[in-house]
Amino acid sequence: LSSARSFLSQSDYESLVEKANFYGSPLEFTIVGYNSNNRKVGPLMNTKWGQEGGYSALCPNEYPAGCVAIAMAQIEKYHEWPQSFDWSGMANDRPTSASQSLIAMIGKAVNMEYGKDESGASLGDAKRGFEAMGYAVSKKDHDMWDVESEIYFRGRPVYMTGDRKNFIGITWKGHAWVCDGAEEYG
């Protein structure tokens, strides 16, 4: 089991030691299977942007930028498209005037509904916003194969959304995010 330290996380290793001890198995005779064919891609993006903390400085009343705008902005930063933006002027870990301009422009493009506590836009508006900026967009249901395909084979982050529904079917509290990595266990 001690050789498993080279490929297991500390917590996984400790869990195996605990199980081996529980069952009275000598550690030197405990076998751990390892598949070196696991495939991991990502994270593809380096940006760590948020809806507030300076990123919303150019939004109306400095209300939160909205998850739609932040997710779209990070994807656009990854592709550095459209070319009209100062991509080199955008830091990955803090707001700059260039990233603030991009986020505000996306907010306008998606008809962002700004609010004091949260801001939002629909999936349809996000799709039209991407298309207006020169992106080819296809709307699909969440399908892990499609998501992994985009990440593994095309090296592209995936814009995703989810909605929560109450018991009578009224949609509320949607959210948008980017999936920019995946791990496949063989």
Name each region found by the language model.
Residues S88-G186:
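Conserved active-site-adjacent core of cysteine acyl-enzyme catalytic domains
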Residues L1-S119:
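Active-site-adjacent structural segments surrounding the nucleophilic cysteine of cysteine proteases
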